[in-house]
Amino acid sequence: MSGPAPRRASRPSERDLVRAARDHLARLGYTVWADPDGHDYFDLVARKGEEVGLVEAKVADARTVVAQALRRRAWGDWTAVVVAGRRGAAGIVARTDGTRAAPIGVWWVDAGSVRELRPARPWVPPGGEDPFAELRTRFRRVLDALASGDLPGGASWDGVGRAIRAASGGRGFAEWRLDEPTREP
């Protein structure tokens, strides 16, 4: 007689993916914040010196996580996505190779550890012109305030980007603005 079928390993939750990515980045020497804006706009923000990386996590819906990483590129020097399995990660790489999403790092979680299928690459090559330089500088100031305690961890701040056309002169592409955190008197 055979016993019950072996249980299939359960798929990790998004919280598990974020935790694994946070631990992975901390081991690499980054200071890491999970949901630093209190609005769940940024899943993870990692900083080492002046370098800022952003990580978006999704258990399913790979297209959405890639779109999120592309939208958030204005604030980080690099972005990565972390998904629940190697097959999903491989699908993301196959769909994004040769596209503007190719610099996005693609990671998956295996038994609680992050595996990198494609490492994250900088959005702007060394010496290249950075169309988001001002936004990245402002975002670093927000991270400085978080690191120093001037902006308490877990405090809600308006870091969610808004599509505006001011700098583009209305030429049809959206640019992003980072709202400064506000202090209560």
Predicted segment positions?
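Catalytic cores of nucleic-acid endonucleases
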Residues: V59-A111
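Short, solvent-exposed polar/charged micro-motifs at secondary-structure junctions
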Residues: F42-A46, E116-P119
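Acidic-basic catalytic patches of nuclease active cores, encompassing PD-(D/E)XK
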Residues: M1-D40, R47-G49, R100-A102
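Conserved catalytic cores of phosphodiester-cleaving nucleases, focusing on short active-site segments
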Residues: A21, L44-D61, A80
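Non-catalytic C-terminal interaction segments of nucleic acid-processing enzymes
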Residues: G3, G98-P185
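Short, well-structured alpha-helical interface segments that form or flank functional binding sites
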Residues: D16, H39, R63-A67, T137
